[in-house]
């Protein structure tokens, strides 16, 4: 029996208008959270309590529209927003608002008869120019007070959480790792334990068991570290059987796990027969083998080499161990690694000696390896009075951690969307005959500030006009409604967040404007019988 599916097809402006409805609905849901007076969003969850959140990522992930054409727009803009959050830790809402403004302005330009090529080129050029201006306005983050300001804004002005974030970053260092967990009571706390972060994530989204965070979280996993490719389920069947029997998660870290081995792990995981995850091996080329040996020392195991059919004598107890593993799309965190401290220190010293004679490229690889061995893991436990409150605070703390680290690396600028709006408004006032594509970007760049002002009860056009008359660094303070020097007031945004939000929003909006045809599945299915 064959099931024949059908497509519904839309063309040209009709396709773009349908996509536009989805982008607008996503933006309308997300933008209410912007600024110090932003509102919470209440989200129903099947078989779980509802979520109350001010986190743009969580809101965006929850939106799935019945209109399939509109949902295409939701998916693409959500991807751009999530990419911003993954790379900078914040800026999801800003990226969404910018993408919608750019797309709607672009649609109007196309409807007015402007050519797609003209619009695209102008938008890309203006976006690059504006990003360079943002980078040029960067102010370095030098003191703990500067860090505290960034964290305080990102965590929505909860000073106790902001202080814990700064303490956590200081405890593990700029390149160290901090994870966020739930506290058992109302109080939040910080603990530093042995562990490491791997710049590789899960190889398949089917291993995700925390959809709200797109994460695979496993407690007390048995971790197989190998330099061999695993393609047959027979290579790991005894591990899988023991994992299911003991209800202990099974993890593979290696160069490649494919074929029926990967299929068996995915099938048994999705059917809840066992918990598992497959991670890509760190580094490339000759550095990969040594990096895998580092992992073995950290996790207290040995590297499995040679023919995988000869691994039958190994049990889960012989594999690597840690208290908790959290794997995301591009990174994995091992908390409470069970390796010997003395072995880690010895290995670290060997790497330090090798760095003395290494060229620049090799030295960077060695430095990464040494950092994995030396850096502890900070566990920031977030408390609250209810499960909903704890979940909402956790989301904000995770965003704030990334944003604070981003500020340390690229500096900060005046926040609340004020810098983008100020630069854009001055450009629009000074050049009234700029190409249409450039004008689209500069008009859209004012939209985040407009929304923040609106959420705070101010008149957006009045605020924009006032800012355009002030020198750089001045902007709108949504807390008291005044125009002031935002850098002095501590209202700041990391450069990376602002830059990536604009870059990713421009990229997705330009691609959406280029759509000439869109297709979605028709719900009608034909069933035909073969001879």
Where does each model-flagged region fall?
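Long, structured protein-protein interaction/assembly regions in large complexes
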Residues: 128-414, 518-531
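N-terminal, positively charged regions that mediate nucleic acid binding
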Residues: 1-47
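Glycine/serine-rich anion-binding loops at beta->alpha junctions
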Residues: 10, 84-94, 412-414
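Glycine-rich oxoanion-binding loops at beta->alpha junctions
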Residues: 49-85, 203-215, 220-221, 225-238
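Core structural elements
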Residues: 46, 97-104, 128-131, 135, ...
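A structural-propensity feature for long, helix-poor, extended segments
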Residues: 109-151, 217-220, 226, 311-338, ...
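Residue-level signature of catalytic and energy-coupling elements of molecular machines
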Residues: 19, 35, 89, 113, ...
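Extended, low-charge hydrophobic alpha-helical regions
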Residues: 11, 17-19, 64, 69-71, ...
């Amino acid at each position: 029996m064959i099931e024949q599916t059908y497509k519904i097809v839309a063309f040209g402006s009709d396709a773009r208008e349908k996509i536009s409805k989805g982008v607008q609905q996503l933006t309308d849901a997300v933008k209410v959270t912007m600024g110090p007076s932003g509102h919470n969003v209440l989200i129903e969850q099947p078989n779980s309590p509802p979520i109350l959140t001010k986190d743009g990522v969580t809101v965006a992930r929850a939106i799935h529209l019945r209109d399939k054409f509109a949902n295409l727009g939701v998916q693409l803009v959500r991807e751009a927003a999530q990419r911003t959050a993954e790379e900078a830790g914040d800026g999801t809402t800003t990226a969404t608002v910018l993408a919608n403004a750019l797309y709607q302005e672009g649609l109007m330009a196309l409807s007015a008869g402007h050519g797609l090529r003209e619009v695209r080129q102008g938008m890309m050029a203006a976006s690059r120019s504006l990003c360079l201006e943002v980078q040029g306005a960067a102010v370095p983050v030098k003191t703990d007070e500067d860090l505290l300001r960034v964290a305080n804004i990102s965590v929505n002005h909860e000073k106790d959480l902001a202080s814990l974030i700064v303490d956590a970053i200081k405890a593990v260092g700029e390149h160290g790792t901090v994870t966020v967990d739930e506290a058992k009571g109302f109080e939040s706390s910080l603990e530093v334990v042995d562990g490491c972060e791997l710049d590789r994530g899960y190889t398949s989204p089917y291993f995700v068991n925390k959809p709200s965070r797109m994460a695979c979280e496993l407690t007390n996993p048995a971790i197989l570290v190998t330099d061999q490719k695993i393609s047959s389920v027979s290579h790991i069947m005894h591990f899988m059987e023991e994992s299911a029997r003991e209800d202990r998660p099974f993890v593979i870290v290696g160069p490649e796990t494919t074929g029926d081995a990967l299929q068996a792990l995915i099938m048994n995981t999705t059917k809840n027969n066992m918990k598992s995850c497959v991670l890509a091996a760190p580094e490339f080329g000759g550095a990969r083998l040594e990096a895998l040996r580092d992992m073995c020392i950290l996790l207290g195991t040995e590297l499995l080499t040679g023919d995988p059919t000869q691994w039958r004598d190994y049990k889960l107890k012989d594999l690597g161990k840690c208290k908790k593993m959290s794997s995301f799309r591009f990174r994995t965190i091992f908390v409470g690694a069970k390796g010997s401290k003395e072995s880690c220190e010895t290995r670290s010293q060997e790497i330090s000696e090798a760095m003395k004679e290494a060229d620049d490229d090799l030295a960077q690889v060695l430095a990464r390896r040494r950092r994995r061995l030396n850096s502890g893991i900070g566990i920031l436990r977030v408390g609250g009075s209810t499960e909903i409150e704890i979940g909402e605070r956790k989301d904000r703390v995770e965003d704030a951690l990334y944003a604070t680290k981003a500020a340390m690396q690229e500096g900060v600028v005046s926040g609340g969307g004020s810098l983008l709006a100020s630069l854009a408004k001055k450009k629009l006032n000074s050049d009234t005959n700029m190409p249409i594509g450039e004008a689209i970007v500069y008009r859209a760049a004012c939209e985040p500030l407009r929304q923040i002002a609106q959420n705070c009860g101010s008149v957006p056009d009045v605020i924009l006009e006032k800012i355009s008359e002030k020198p750089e660094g001045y902007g709108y303070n949504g807390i008291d409604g005044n125009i002031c020097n935002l850098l002095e007031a501590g209202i700041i945004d990391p450069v990376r967040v602002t830059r990536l939000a604009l870059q990713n929003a421009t990229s997705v909006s330009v691609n959406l404007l280029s759509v000439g045809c869109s297709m979605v599945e028709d719900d009608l299915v034909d069933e035909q019988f073969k001879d």
